Amino acid sequence: MLRQDGADGRSLADYVAPGDYGFDSPAGMFAISVHETHPAGCDCPACSMEYDSLLNRSLRLTLAEAASGWLDAELEKQLPNGSPVKIVKPAAGYASCPDHSLKRDILALLPDGDQLDIRLTESCAMIPDASICGLVFAHPAASYPEIRRLPAEALDAYAALRGFSPEDARLFLSHLR
């Protein structure tokens, strides 16, 4: 995982839960996807409006976020009452987890992940766009550390650990330079 540059130097790896937290795993992964019901189009009266595609996309994005909210609630139910543990779900490609290529790993490692039918573009944009994938951490100090800029040495070391080619390093990490 990438680590912030500077005094705090926080990383999501700092929030891997110790075994005594009561979870089966010290960290987790998730993926959510909402597909169109009529991807080729439909000729029913409700689908003939000009704004149908915008409405459809808006609904799918809202459903994906609602599913993520449901997952939050389900995970929090697993915590004992009064637990100081916080649960964070950083999505791959966002400021806490800025490497979009982690989506490949998450989708490959999830049991039955292929049944979600999420496809990735060369730059790891998700199709359908109403898809979310990320990591799950449970820890009392859990937060979303923002990683916006890193020194070249840190990026080069991370690229080497991930086994990136120079092209992949440019594609997935250049925004952090």
Where do the language-model regions lie?
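Active-site loops and adjacent core secondary-structure elements that bind or stabilize anionic groups
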Residues: 1-53, 87
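Structural beta-strand/beta-sheet cores of well-ordered domains, especially the beta-sheet scaffolds
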Residues: 25-30, 59, 133, 162
